[in-house]
């Protein structure tokens, strides 16, 4: 899991050597678990790695904090058997249109969506969960009980978004969470 995160960080900062990306990612994960905010992490990154710009340090800190939050939540969900979540966006002018398009869509932890492709955007960042791409402030809202499932829902299944009733979703896709 950490190796994947390191490679993603290095991809974010193309000029960054892989060992530096590994150091920064490990530091961010450690500090974030202690409750340190993204802005504080960005300042610490700048202090330790002055070759980075303030904008890059902020981008990396914000992205890694969001990604770490999502990865920890995904791990917790797998532990309790929660296989689905609802994509939630922040509903403001800075939210990507592809992420607004995903807002309210029920997704599986095992099949992350490709929001840009689903919206027909030319950019393609591949499949990812909310919070797991640069500057994303979206978050997953886990579905743990049947009561949390929306009445009429949009569900991401195998690269498409389909509409279905709560009853249909439960019959076809829901397995009781322990």
Describe the predicted segments one by one:
Residues 48-55:
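Short, basic interhelical loop/turn and adjoining N-cap
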Residues 16-20, 53, 130:
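Secondary-structure capping and boundary motifs in well-ordered enzyme cores
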Residues 62-178:
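Activation/maturation switch segments at domain boundaries
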């Amino acid at each position: 899991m950490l190796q994947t995160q390191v490679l993603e960080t290095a991809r974010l900062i193309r000029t960054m050597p892989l060992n530096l990306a590994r150091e920064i990612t490990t530091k961010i994960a450690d500090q974030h678990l202690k409750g340190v905010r993204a802005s504080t992490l960005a300042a610490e990154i700048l202090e330790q790695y002055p070759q980075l710009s303030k904008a890059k340090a902020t981008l990396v800190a914000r992205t890694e904090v969001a990604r770490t939050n999502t990865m920890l939540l995904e791990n917790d969900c797998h532990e309790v058997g929660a296989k689905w979540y609802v994509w939630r966006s922040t509903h403001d002018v800075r939210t990507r249109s592809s992420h607004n398009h995903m807002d309210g869509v029920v997704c599986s932890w095992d099949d992350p969506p490709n929001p840009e492709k689903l919206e027909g955007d030319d950019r393609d960042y591949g499949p990812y969960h909310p919070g797991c791409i640069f500057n994303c402030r979206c978050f997953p809202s886990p579905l743990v009980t049947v009561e949390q499932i929306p009445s009429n829902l949009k569900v991401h299944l195998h690269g498409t978004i389909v509409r279905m009733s709560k009853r249909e979703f439960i019959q076809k896709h829901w397995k009781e969470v322990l």
